[in-house]
A protein has these predicted regions:
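Extreme N-terminus of proteins, especially the signal/transit-peptide cleavage junction
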Residues: 1-3
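Short, glycine-/small- and polar/acidic-enriched structural segments
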Residues: 6, 13-98
Length: 98
């Protein structure tokens, strides 16, 4: 008998084989959902809706520090995208360059 697990991932080329069934998880009957990062992160951190999910690393670190985390982090980076299109500093900081 296979273990039923809910799996939430983004719709990336690196998850597509799992989503369309070309790749199986041994011993698992996955209920796979493709969601936007915003919806995944909100539902995971607010309600722990998924057995397996992508998480915001920063939000995970904060929840871990606060003792409120419900997930165990694995070092798997699916999106491979730099999430910060811009970073702002106050003029009073004295920082002039990156």
């Amino acid at each position: 008998m296979k273990l039923s697990l809910s799996v939430a991932v983004g719709n990336y080329d690196r998850t597509r084989a799992l989503v369309d069934g070309r790749v199986q998880i041994d011993g698992v009957h996955p209920a796979i959902m493709t969601l936007s990062p915003e919806e995944m992160f909100f539902r995971a951190f607010r309600h722990a809706d998924f057995d397996i999910t992508e998480l915001s690393l920063a939000s995970y670190a904060v929840s871990l520090a606060n003792g409120a985390n419900k997930y165990v982090a694995l070092p798997i980076f699916l999106s491979r995208a730099f999430r910060h299109s811009s970073i702002y500093v106050t003029r009073a900081s004295g920082i002039q360059t990156p």
